[in-house]
Swiss-Prot record:
CDD domains: bHLH_TS_dAS-C_like
Gene name in the database record: sc
GO terms under cellular component: RNA polymerase II transcription regulator complex; transcription regulator complex
Alphabetical keyword list: Developmental protein, Differentiation, Neurogenesis
Role: AS-C proteins are involved in the determination of the neuronal precursors in the peripheral nervous system and the central nervous system. Also involved in sex determination and dosage compensation.
Span list, region Disordered: 78-109
Tissue note: L(1)SC, SC and AC strongly label the presumptive stomatogastric nervous system, while ASE is more prominent in the presumptive procephalic lobe. Associates with the somatic nuclei through nuclear cycles 9 and 10. During nuclear cycle 11 distributes uniformly in the embryo.
Name assigned to this protein: Achaete-scute complex protein T4
SMART domains in the record: HLH (SM00353)
Length: 345
């Protein structure tokens, strides 16, 4: 009996020592043995409600914990998540956190890529000579990388140089435009002096209305031609019939222009007869040679007309002369714009 009791005590002590050593390994060999033979480890003893004879009544049983390496634990966790049924949902916190982290990392990589591409494109637009000049040599070749700060500084300086170049070019063009405006002003001064000398006898209180079948735009072209032709030719007055003067245009559709001795004639530089007539006290007409040239030009303009309309033209002094927008051709509008610009200056 005593031998049996001694053997049982020794086995219980050895098992307790083995269990403590296996539960809390202190060496690498014991840890590897536990990891290798963990599937054949003894199961913990079931709890007895009445208590064990070897343990005191007030003591709690020892809780054992298996040792598992970190890599194996992560593998088992992933396998358990993948082996779940489709209806069951995995742990939401860890999965959502990993997806949000992946999306954030992807956005950050995309942002960095766009920034790098933008700086590379900006560097391609800057000439290498400008880079060499602004970096003062520095041993940087065309394929050397420049920092983002240096790239921005070089780009700003390059833009400033381009702006200075544009300003210089605009300054030269402005000088040319000023010269053109000066020449135009001189021409307008000459034309205005000639028109003022030819309209000294005009009356501001009376206006004469003429019926004319020629449209406005050929009439204005005719006036310009007359100004150019009779600019330096003197005007000669010839006495005609005291009752009525009629001048018929060779083209049958050109109509007839007549003036009466009872009306005070008021003409302006825009009138079709002001450059070939001179008025004194009676009714006069220009030199026959000038009148023939004038009628030839009227005939030529009349042949170019496609439509004929009856227009009642009102001839006013040069200071009050205005045309409607619909009566002006593009060339006439340009001339009027130049005249208004000169008057404003």
């Amino acid at each position: 009996m005593k031998n049996n009791n001694n053997t049982t005590k020794s086995t219980t002590m050895s098992s307790s020592v083995l269990s403590t050593n296996e539960t809390f390994p202190t060496t690498i060999n014991s840890a590897t043995k536990i990891f290798r033979y963990q599937h054949i480890m003894p199961a913990p003893s079931p709890l007895i409600p009445g208590g064990n004879q070897n343990q005191p009544a007030g003591t709690m049983p020892i809780k054992t914990r298996k040792y598992t390496p970190r890599g194996m634990a992560l593998t088992r966790c992933s396998e358990s998540v993948s082996s779940l049924s489709p209806g069951s949902s995995p742990a939401p916190y860890n999965v959502d956190q990993s997806q949000s982290v992946q999306r954030r990392n992807a956005r950050e990589r995309n942002r960095v890529k766009q920034v790098n591409n933008s700086f590379a494109r900006l560097r391609q637009h800057i000439p290498q000579s400008i880079i060499t000049d602004l970096t003062k040599g520095g041993g940087r070749g065309p394929h050397k990388k420049i920092s983002k700060v240096d790239t921005l500084r070089i780009a700003v300086e390059y833009i400033r140089r381009l702006q200075d170049l544009v300003d210089d070019l605009n300054g030269g063009s402005n000088i040319g435009a000023n010269n053109a405006v000066t020449q135009l002003q001189l021409c307008l001064d000459e034309s205005s002096s000639h028109s003022s000398s030819s309209s000294t006898c005009s009356s501001s209180g009376h206006n004469t209305y003429y019926q004319n079948t020629i449209s406005v735009s050929p009439l204005q072209q005719q006036q310009q031609l007359q100004r150019q032709q009779f600019n330096h030719q003197p005007l000669t007055a010839l006495s005609l019939n005291t009752n009525l003067v009629g001048t018929s245009v060779p083209g049958g559709d050109a109509g007839c222009v007549s003036t009466s001795k009872n009306q005070q004639t008021c003409h302006s530089p825009t009138s079709s007869f002001n450059s070939s007539m001179s008025f004194d006290s009676g009714t006069y007409e220009g030199v026959p040679q000038q009148i023939s040239t004038h009628l030839d030009r009227l005939d030529h303009l009349d042949n170019e007309l496609h439509t004929h309309s009856q227009l009642q033209l009102k001839f006013e002094p040069y200071e009050h002369f205005q045309l409607d927008e619909e009566d002006c051709t593009p060339d006439d509008e340009e001339i009027l714009d130049y005249i208004s610009l000169w008057q404003e200056q």
